[in-house]
């Protein structure tokens, strides 16, 4: 291949990459614009989800939630969904009082009180609270 051909091919690829990056930036900007809307008082919504597997093939999930709670309430979990719960539940770490598990699952506070587990049969879902 000639040197001139390689230069044109490289220039073409570079232009395509710049176009894709520019287009992607506009899509992300547009998506962020839609996220800025107000959450109804007393409700929560998921604004970002993250999911991966570690080397032990255990699936790890995390989410970012936006809540607008009434006075005396904070962000929590009810029936495996983000919700506003009484602040004393979180302050006292009485996690199972906010009913975080699905119907039919058993809730247990973790020994270090930094979260809870929901179990049904041999399936266990563990949630750790991070601030």
From Swiss-Prot:
A GO biological-process term:
memory
For this record, an example GO cellular component is: extracellular space
Q: What is its main location?
A: cytoplasm
Q: Does the keyword Nucleus apply?
A: yes
UniProt subcellular location: Cytoplasm; Nucleus
Tissue note? Brain-specific.
Q: Which residues form a coiled coil?
A: none
What keywords is this UniProt entry annotated with?
A: Cytoplasm, Nucleus, Signal
Where is the secretion signal located? 1-30
Q: Name one Pfam family in it.
A: TAFA
Q: Name one GO molecular function term.
A: receptor ligand activity
Q: What does the protein in this record do? A: Has a role as neurotrophic factor involved in neuronal survival and neurobiological functions.
Q: Which family does it belong to?
A: Belongs to the TAFA family.
Q: Which PANTHER family match?
A: CHEMOKINE-LIKE PROTEIN TAFA FAMILY MEMBER, CHEMOKINE-LIKE PROTEIN TAFA-2
Q: What is the designated name of this protein?
A: Chemokine-like protein TAFA-2
Q: Organism, per UniProt?
A: Homo sapiens (Human)
Taxonomic placement: Eukaryota, Metazoa, Chordata, Craniata, Vertebrata
Q: Which gene encodes it?
A: TAFA2
